[in-house]
Amino acid sequence: RDIGVTGVQTCALPIFDLSPADVAAICDRRSGIGADGILRAVAADRVPEWDGPGGIWFMDYRNADGSIAEMCGNGLRVFLRHLAEQGLVDDTADVPIATRAGLRTGRFLRDGRISTTMGPVTTGDPVTIALPGHAWTATSANVGNPHAVVRLGSEGELAGLDLGTAPTWTPLEAYPDGVNVEFYVQRTADRIHLRVHERGVGETPSCGTGVVAAAAVACPGGRCIVRVLGGELEVDLTGPEAVLTGPAVIVASGEYRLAEGDAA
């Protein structure tokens, strides 16, 4: 079954490397474990591309198709939960985590949720996002990874979207490495409903960076409650960095045996 956290299914694995084919096999929902992505916990000192502080953990995130992603907001919380349950970090103090999008900090709250810094959010030029028979003007946003955020007019329009097909965009050069696309409906000044199509994955019950990107467009400079298919998350945009808060639960653990020679 899925191994997940609040609407996003991720697997936390040991430090040996994995090929894209390994990742895709593990994430396959019929022949593997089934997941939206894989998290590898690696000592940051062992990661050549990391030039920040040492003595901390690096979150190596892979999409379900095996591609490398800069960041996963919901994955970051389950990563922290995994490290805490394994006794690898102190859950009574703020915990710095290295990611491809930069340094992030996690905080374990008394109510069981976890807050994480998500870095600054930047918005850019409008782009056109299209699905078969429909096109919308979207706002570009960056949360350490690329997003295009579309505001819709009604709950019916949101519910009626067919996200089984990946959205396309113009101009093509806006997102040379692909883009995560968020569709939202504004319910109140500080509450939105959201659906997400993640690059390399498809529609997911939630996407932490997508939640932050949509909140930044819908509730700039404020606080926002975002309801996704997997539940509700809170975004605080009042400071220099966005802060994402939500639950993170380890629902299963076990062993997965790769075919001999599969692991890189």
Q: What is each of the regions a protein language model found here?
A:
Residues 1-11:
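Single conserved hydrophobic/aromatic residue that forms the stacking wall/gate
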Residues 29-68, 90, 172-201:
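Anion-binding (especially nucleotide phosphate/pyrophosphate-binding) glycine-rich loop
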Residues 243-264:
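Short, basic/aromatic-enriched C-terminal tail that caps enzymatic domains
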Residues 64-141, 205-207, 216-243, 250:
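Acidic, low-complexity central loop/insert segments
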Residues 12-37:
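Intrinsically disordered, low-complexity, positively charged segments
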Residues 12, 41-42, 109, 149-153, ...:
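Short beta-strand-to-turn element immediately C-terminal to the catalytic PLP-Schiff-base lysine
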Residues 125-141, 148-174, 178-182:
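Anionic-ligand binding region
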